[in-house]
Amino acid sequence: MFVGVARHSGSQDEVSRGVEPLEAARAQPAKDRRAKGTPKSSKPGKKHRYLRLLPEALIRFGGFRKRKKAKSSVSKKPGEVDDSLEQPCGLGCLVSTCCECCNNIRCFMIFYCILLICQGVVFGLIDVSIGDFQKEYQLKTIEKLALEKSYDISSGLVAIFIAFYGDRKKVIWFVASSFLIGLGSLLCAFPSINEENKQSKVGIEDICEEIKVVSGCQSSGISFQSKYLSFFILGQTVQGIAGMPLYILGITFIDENVATHSAGIYLGIAECTSMIGYALGYVLGAPLVKVPENTTSATNTTVNNGSPEWLWTWWINFLFAAVVAWCTLIPLSCFPNNMPGSTRIKARKRKQLHFFDSRLKDLKLGTNIKDLCAALWILMKNPVLICLALSKATEYLVIIGASEFLPIYLENQFILTPTVATTLAGLVLIPGGALGQLLGGVIVSTLEMSCKALMRFIMVTSVISLILLVFIIFVRCNPVQFAGINEDYDGTGKLGNLTAPCNEKCRCSSSIYSSICGRDDIEYFSPCFAGCTYSKAQNQKKMYYNCSCIKEGLITADAEGDFIDARPGKCDAKCYKLPLFIAFIFSTLIFSGFSGVPIVLAMTRVVPDKLRSLALGVSYVILRIFGTIPGPSIFKMSGETSCILRDVNKCGHTGRCWIYNKTKMAFLLVGICFLCKLCTIIFTTIAFFIYKRRLNENTDFPDVTVKNPKVKKKEETDL
C-alpha cells in the first residue's frame, strides 16, 4: 500500500482554514515592494553566515522543504493535485541540482534492469550446474529437494509481507535487494573458494580387460558436500528473499510513475532484461557442464580442492554478479519514493479504474496484522484476480518445462553433446521468451488496450502457441541402433541387457557412459561393452581396435595399417530436422511470452490501487504453489518414465538416465506443455467473462479510457 495524496472534500472548515494563508499571500507583494525601497543594512561584500557554516546542498534541501510546506499550507481547489509528497533525488539530506536530471523513471530503469540481469545470471548458473552437482556428490532425495526448492519456498514465504509492508518505502527495499543479491551470490561461491578437502574418485578402465582393480567407494566428499550444500541452500534462500522486492514492488513502482498505457513497455523491458540475465548465466555455465571422459588405465585418482575443476570457474561468475549488484546500491538509494509527476499520474489513474467495489476506492489500511488479513480477504474474494494468478502459474509451467527438459530432449533426440545441447537450449529458450515479453509489452502499450482487451490478447496468443506446440511432436528423429537397447548384438544378446557373450569376460561397468560408434553403424555404451581390447590416439582422438562385438561394416585402416573398429562419440542419426524444430520451438516461446506482461497489467487493473502490491504478492504465492515448486518435479518425473537405461555405479548410487525413449519423450514433453497452455486459456476465459459481467453490472464505472480514437470506438462497441 503506498501513501497516496490526501483527497480534499472542499468543506467549509477547510475553506475557512485556508482564508488566513490566502490573505497573507495577497499581502506579501506589498510588503516586498516596501522592502525594496529601504536601503540594505548589510555590507555588499559580506556573505550570509549560513553559507560559511553549512554545505550548499543542505541549504537547498532546507529551502526545498520550506517551499513545499508553504505550498501545502494553502488549501487546494477540488480539481487541483497536491504534489507536496514528491521528493528530490539525492542521498539522504545531500541534494544536488545535477542529480535532478536523473530523477525520472528512465534512469531508475537502468539500475533496476542491471539488478535484474545480475539475479538472472545467478539463476542461470545455478540451473545449468545443479544437475552435475547432484550427480557428482550423490545427493539424497531430501537434499535434492532442499537444493532445488529453497529459492521458491523462501520467496513464497516472504512475498505477502514484503508486498504489504514494503509498499510504503519501496526504494529502501530495492537497496536491500541489491545487497542481498550480492550476498547470496557470495554464499554460493564461498565454499568452492576455500575448500581444501580431497575427494577420491573411481578410475575405471574403458577397454576390455579380464583383470581390473577398481577402488574408491570407501572415500567420499562428505565434508565438502555438507559444507557446500549448506552454503548453497542459504544462498538460494537469500536470493529468494532478494527477488520479491524487485518483482513485486518494482512493478508497482514503475506502474505508479508512468502513464497507464506506457506501463506495458517498461514492464516488457524489465521482463526482457531478466531473461537476458538468465540466458547470460546459462551460456556462461554451459561450457562448464561436466562431460564423462574416457580413461586409459585403472587408477585411483584424487581431485584437489574437493570439487571438480569446473567449480573454480563457476565461483568467479558468482563473484562477478555480486560485484555488479553491489554497484547499484548507491544509485538506487538516491531515488525518491515519489518521483516528480507521480502524484498527477496516480490521481489520473484513480479516475480511470473502477471495476472493483466503489466502497474500496478510498480504502485506508493500517500496518498491523488485522489490516493485512482484511486486505488479503478482499483480494481472495476477487475471482478475476485469482483466475489471472492461476493463468500466470500455468503459463510459467511451460517455461519451466522447456528450461528443465529441452537440453535433455535436444541431446537425445538430435544426438548432441551435453555442452552443445545446453548452449543451444539457452540460445533458443531465453531469446524467444525475452523477445515475446518485450513485444507483448510494446503491443499492448501501442494499442492502448483496456483490461478486457488484455484478456482477449492473452487468449489469442495462447491459442496460437498451442497450435505451434502441436507441430513440434511431428519433428523428431528415428532412434539410432544401440547395442543392448534396441539391437541384440547381432542376435547373440538380449534387448535391455548391455552384457552379451562377446563382452561378458570384460567386467564392464555402466557407471561411466562413453559411447562409441562401431564400423557397423551401431552405437555401444562404452569401448568395454564393444569388446575393444586396444586403443591409441589418432589426430587427438582415441580410436579402438580388436573389438570382439563388432563383426560387420566397412574396414578402415589408420596411418600405421591397423584396422579401426570404432571411434568415440555417437553415431550419425542422419536426421536433419533440428533447424525445423528450433523454428517451431522459438515461435512457440515468442507467442507464449506475449501473455506475460498483459497478465500482470490485468491483475493491477482489477484491484484498488492501494492493494496492487499486495495483489502481486498473492499472485506470486499462487505462482510458487501451483507453478515453480511442483513444475520441475512434474517434468522430471515425466522424463524418468521415458528412461531406458540408468546409471547405477559400482558404489550402488543411482545416477542420471543415459538413454531415453525418444518417441515417448516427445509425446510427454508436448503433452504436458499442451495441458498447461490449455489451462491458461481456460482460466483467462473465466476471468474475462466474470470481468465482463461485473462491468455490465456496474455501468456507473466505465472501463479504462483510451486515447486512440479507433481503439476507443472498438471498445465502445464491445461493451
UniProtKB/Swiss-Prot annotation:
Keyword Transport tagged: yes
Location of the region described as Disordered in the Swiss-Prot/TrEMBL record: 1-46
Keywords: Cell membrane, Disulfide bond, Glycoprotein, Membrane, Transmembrane, Transmembrane helix, Transport
Subcellular location: Cell membrane
A single GO BP: sodium-independent organic anion transport
Membrane topology: Multi-pass membrane protein
UniProt cross-references to InterPro entries, sorted A to Z: Kazal_dom (IPR002350), Kazal_dom_sf (IPR036058), MFS_trans_sf (IPR036259), OATP (IPR004156)
Domain named Kazal-like: residues: 496-551
Domain of life (superkingdom): Eukaryota
Entry GO terms, CC: basolateral plasma membrane
Basic residues compositional bias, start-end: 33-46
Name listed for the protein in its UniProt record: Solute carrier organic anion transporter family member 6A1
